[in-house]
Each structure stands twice: as structure tokens, then as C-alpha cells.
Amino acid sequence: MRVRVLLTVLFLVPAAGCTAGDGEAAQSVRAESSFGAKPTITFPEGEPPADLQVGEQMTGTGAVVEAEDLVVAHYTAHVWDGADNPLLASSFNQGAPASFPLGQSLTGVSKALQGHRVGSRVVAAIPPEEGFGPNPPDGMAADSALFYVIDVLGAFPPEAAATGAGGPGTLAGIEVEGGPGERPVLTLPRTAPPGGFRSKVLIRGKGARVRAGQLVVTQYEGRVWGADASFESTWQARQPRAFRIGNGGVVKGWERALVGVPVGSRVVMILPPDLGYDKGLPPLIKPSDTLAFVVDVLAAY
């Protein structure tokens, strides 16, 4: 299932690499607020640095961010032009944090975050070749330097999985193998779909319950009923995904199955066509297809 990832356009542009500096220039920019709150940013006079400069204004105590992680963060980004330094974008203006896979992110952002811990505030002065390079967003020059303030809320490795209590289970002939911390194995029956919506929590997490409007981090596999192979799997792609639930960004069946489920849970669900892709998703899914999903709820923000 192709879910919409929030605000990733500000991170997901390839660029050439360089070595990070000691962060003196980045630290000279004042970013004032508590962690997780929109900062007030004051730039020094003069031009931005020519190389990548990274600093840490707050130090977290969570997991260390690794190169293949999906990162969830609040951020504010400016064009650092040495004059007006205009705001580029901020997750605080969108009502939810951003999510982005480091392996597909701006080179400067990826390098800046690796090695820092969840709960840290990272600041980065990013030169053009480590930012958008020759493909900047509309209204921004190709030679623009950037400045990011990033509050790291979470980091999720490719093997992240449900962590609650429970294990293998069945739903209307579907079999799901695998326990907490393990990748699930999904097997569908060779029978007609049961009709109607069904869902079942196989592993029940101990976290807060998912609320409509939150950004939810997941691992999942989706199958067309009767198919031997998945049409999409974050496990196979080695990349957890995040989406905003309750705003029409995912299929209706996901919203029905996941809102109210505790974080850390694994849910298996059967979606009739009207709760899945009722218009189809050619060439993978026809409008008449019933779908089966197994979803691990890793976090909600």
C-alpha cells in the first residue's frame, strides 16, 4: 500500500557527499525553544559556511540513529543566504512530525543525524552540494545553503517489529507466524474471501492507543486475497513507513483497524473492496479485490 509520508520532499533529494565539519558555524545560529517546540532562530551576520557543519544543542538518551533508520522528527529549515534567511518549511506548521528514511534523504541531513541519539536537537548548516543540488524546490536557487534544526523523536531500523504480548494467530483462514520482535509470515487460504471487514490483534502492545490525526510508524505486508506474493512489504523493502491516520491518507480499512490499537501491537486485517482500493491500483490491485494485511504498529506521534 502506497501511504503518504509527510514532508519528506524537504529531505528526499539525492546530492553529492562531503565530510562534516566540527559544527562551529552551525552552533553560532541560535535556535531557542524547548525540545519538541518550534524554535525561534537567529542567524549571525555574514555568509554561511562552505562545508557541512553539524552541532548538537540538546543531547538525548534514546537509541543511536543509524544509516538505514527511518527517522521521525520535528524540524525547521531555512535557506541560509546571509541576508533574509527565509523559512523553507517547518513540521510545526503541518500539525505533525515528519518522517524520512536516511538512506533516501538529503545527504547533509543524513550525515548530520547519524550517531546522535533519539531525544537530541541537532543543528546543521548544509552547503548546496549536500542539500538540493541542481534540483531545488520551486522558488529556491540551486546554489542555496540550508540550515536545519531537527528534534529527533524516534529512529526505527529495518528489522523493527511489534513488541507486545502475544504470538502467532489466525483470522478467517489467514495464518500469521512469528512472535514479538520477529518478522511475521503471512499465509492466505485457497478459499473465497469471507466478505466484510475483519481485524484481530495478535500481539498487543503496551504503549498508548493510536489516535486519529497522529503520525503512525509501521511495518506491514499487503496481499491480494488468493495471491502467493505481497503487492507491497516494508519488511522486504527493509524500510518501515509512517503515515498520518484519520485524514484520508490511507485506505479506510486501515483507519478502522488501527485507531485505538496500542503502540507495539501486531494487527491482521481483511479489507473488502470498499474499505481498500475500491478504484483499484493498476496493475497490482483490481477494484473488486479483497485485501489482507498484517501491520506492526511501531510508534504514534
Predicted regions and their residues:
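Cross-family detector of peptidyl-prolyl cis-trans isomerase
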Residues: R2-Y301
